Amino acid sequence: MADGGRAVMDRDQMISLVERHLKAEGAGDVEGAVAVYTDDVEHDVVGWPTGPLRGKDAAREFYRHLTANFRTEDERPQHRYFAGDAMVLDQMMTGTVTGSMLGMPGNGRQITFRVLHVFEFADGLISRENVWLDGGAIQQQLA
């Protein structure tokens, strides 16, 4: 036990939970993507117009927008780092922009870009997700 008596998840549990989240997101399964979140989750895609979001309902709206505009086709982890109840995932993502992304029309183009996620966990669920996208690579491929 750590952090005031809360059980710390092990690495395999963290990886499994994040993979469930990403698989659901990639399949366009909004409910599955948020099912692994705590009710008071903080979801922050740095630079996204909405700013940080709080709670499952707000995250659900984000994923509805994302899955309506982007279809994930491949995710390749580059590195994973662990510290206490946190995991950093550095990955390459490939998908098709079916609508728009970062305010730019996708016109059905396939793009590949780097993504850095910082996940925090509480009570066996994801309590925080911060995401940094390689906006320059996205814009260059959509221009």
Regions of interest found by a model, annotated:
Residues A2-A143:
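C-terminal and inter-domain tail/linker signature
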